[in-house]
Amino acid sequence: MAIKLINIGFGNIVSANRLVAIVSPESAPIKRIIQEARDRGMLIDATYGRRTRAVIITDSDHVILSAVQPETVAHRLASKAEEEDINEGEE
């Protein structure tokens, strides 16, 4: 299994294999998840001081804040998966 990396903005990259969810930060439950992660020391802020537009939850219970829209991150993830499928077909 190859390691797939996804750009989440400003040169920050996460492993696509570790992603569980990409969600919007607007709802109260997500805000609660962010605060709990901050309290546990499991929050990674990759916004560079900009507004949080996507919250990425990983399989290790880390919560990553990104200034990129969730749809953009999902599109990058989908295009990486599609690219991998094409490469496997060439082998």
From Swiss-Prot:
InterPro entries: RemA-like. It comes from the Bacteria. NCBIfam families: MtxBflmRegRemA (NF046064), PRK04323.1 (NF003315). Belongs to the RemA family. This is Putative regulatory protein CBO2514/CLC_2370.
